[in-house]
């Protein structure tokens, strides 16, 4: 018997269940054991929209929302201020490592917060008596030569002019006070002006800076044309709702010295703190969460790492605003091998998120992210964001210098549990010994390795590649947003398929003598 083609979809109801597996059937360890991202696929859905219509907005914590689900890992070969700045500009967030002194880490946070301000509340200000020569020297140090001039040389003083590079470029007498050459006919904005109106006034005035003054003419802040250009180039930038500054995260440990470290980070403008531990279910972390919530109730706290719902429950109950999932799944991590402790990442992500999402606590899948497909799978299993170390390693924004080996341009990438990282700084400032509870150990036991990765170029190209690729991936599944993805996974509409070893081989490049794998143009 041949069925009528015009009624093909109606015959689907004759099947006892939909094609593929539900997420609960997939994550059934009695059938498949622990799963990694490579062990399964997501079945495709109906496409009736362009990939550009897919929203990647997601929750980082209970109170912080990002335009893209990308977080850079707090590793000393991945995230310092340069990476954090560009991750925020591209819609994600960077978590600055703490394998350094507290002063150094706070200064990195400060640089991120000052990098792009809607209103620059603490601009460099000079007095009328400052000489042209002094301004030129300031320009060499600071990288710019445009400064507001107030009567007392401070923010809050009466604005009397602005000195710019054009004013001093061809002025040969370096002893002249800036009062003789500064621009006195100024276009200003009044205190209380909106950022939108301020930017429009700056645009129409064709000036480089727009001073904001109060009713008495005292300088209160500044808007910069360079910041306006950045706003145009990075429309998805992650910014504070109140200050319009870039969002910035930083990691700390759970020892007493980290409480003083956090004080300095908060003073620098920190938005979210990550409690950095290989095993988050410790009394040290529970006590740290409670202390932070008492002293800084508005500061968002990401706790972890965890891989079981029992671990998650302790941290949620203590007050965590988000959880970080993963133990031993990173490319440079050997925790599972050395400690016999951990969990396959796919199983861990679903096990924890299924529980944590009931309490409105977002989860970050940390480790094992090697490509766009892994990101999609982590989100499908319930994660709100993915934390990336190895995937971002080797980009221009990571710390360190490039070097050449065997004709390849490389950068160092190491695990925070590697011996190199553990010996980087003294005990009190070392993130690695704290992270792996090794501060008092005479013999350090490595839980990570040191290596090198090939140059990936700038994340200003690489992260947009991840963003667009993720949009296309969700389009193939027939989903328009991360929230819709989670909803349809939970209700069984989105289906999965377990992959055998031969299926994984089939899904990769095969049968070629040679090939070139270019990820993007």
Swiss-Prot record:
Pathway in which the depicted protein is active: Purine metabolism; XMP biosynthesis via de novo pathway; XMP from IMP: step 1/1
Active site, renumbered: 333, 435
Keyword Oxidoreductase found: yes
Annotated GO MF terms: IMP dehydrogenase activity; metal ion binding; nucleotide binding
Alphabetized SUPFAM superfamilies for the sequence: CBS-domain pair, Inosine monophosphate dehydrogenase (IMPDH)
Subunit structure: Homotetramer.
Protein name per UniProt: Inosine-5'-monophosphate dehydrogenase
């Amino acid at each position: 018997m041949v069925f009528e083609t015009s009624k093909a979809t109606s015959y689907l109801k004759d099947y006892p269940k939909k094609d593929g597996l539900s997420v609960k059937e997939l994550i059934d360890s009695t059938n498949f054991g622990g799963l990694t991202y490579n062990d399964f696929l997501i079945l495709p859905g109906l496409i009736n929209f362009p990939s550009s219509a897919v929203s990647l907005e997601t929750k980082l914590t209970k109170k912080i929302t990002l335009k893209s689900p990308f977080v850079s890992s707090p590793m000393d070969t991945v995230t310092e201020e340069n990476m954090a700045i560009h991750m925020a500009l591209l819609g994600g967030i960077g978590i600055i490592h703490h394998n350094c002194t507290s002063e150094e880490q706070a200064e990195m946070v400060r640089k991120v917060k000052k990098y792009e301000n809607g209103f620059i509340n603490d601009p460099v200000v000079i007095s009328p008596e400052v000489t042209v020569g002094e301004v030129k020297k300031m320009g060499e140090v600071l990288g710019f030569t445009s400064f507001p001039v107030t009567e007392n040389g401070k923010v809050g003083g009466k604005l009397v002019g602005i000195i710019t590079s054009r004013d001093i470029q061809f002025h040969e007498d370096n002893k002249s006070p800036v009062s003789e050459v500064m621009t006195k006919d100024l276009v200003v904005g009044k205190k209380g002006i909106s950022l939108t109106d301020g930017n429009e006034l700056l645009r129409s005035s064709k000036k480089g800076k727009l001073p904001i003054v109060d009713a008495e003419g005292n300088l209160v802040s500044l808007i910069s044309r360079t910041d306006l250009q950045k706003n145009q180039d990075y429309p998805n930038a992650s910014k504070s709702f109140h200050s319009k500054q870039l969002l910035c995260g930083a990691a700390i440990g759970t020892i007493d010295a980290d409480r003083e470290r956090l004080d300095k980070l908060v003073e620098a403008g920190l938005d979210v703190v990550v409690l950095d531990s290989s095993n988050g279910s410790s009394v040290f972390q529970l006590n740290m969460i409670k202390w932070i919530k008492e002293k800084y109730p508005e500061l968002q706290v990401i706790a972890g790492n965890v891989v079981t719902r029992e671990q998650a429950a302790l941290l949620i109950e203590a007050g965590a605003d988000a959880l970080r999932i993963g133990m031993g799944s990173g490319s440079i991590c050997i925790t599972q091998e050395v400690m016999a402790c951990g969990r396959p990442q796919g199983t861990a992500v679903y096990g924890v998120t299924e529980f944590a999402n009931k309490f409105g606590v977002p989860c970050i899948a940390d480790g094992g992210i090697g490509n766009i497909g892994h990101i999609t799978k982590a989100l499908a299993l319930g994660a709100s964001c993915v934390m990336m170390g190895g995937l971002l390693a080797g980009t221009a924004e990571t710390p360190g210098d490039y070097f050449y080996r065997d004709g390849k341009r490389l950068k160092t990438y190491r695990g925070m549990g590697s011996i190199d990282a553990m010996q980087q700084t003294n005990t009190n400032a070392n993130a690695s010994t704290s992270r792996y509870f090794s501060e008092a150990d005479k013999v350090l036991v490595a839980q990570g390795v040191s290596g090198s990765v090939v140059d990936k170029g700038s994340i200003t190209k690489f992260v947009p590649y991840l963003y667009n690729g993720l949009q296309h991936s969700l389009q193939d599944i027939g989903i328009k947003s991360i929230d819709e993805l989670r909803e349809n996974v939970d209700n069984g509409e989105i289906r999965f398929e377990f992959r055998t070893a031969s299926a994984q081989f089939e899904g990769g490049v095969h049968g070629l003598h040679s090939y070139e794998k270019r990820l993007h143009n």
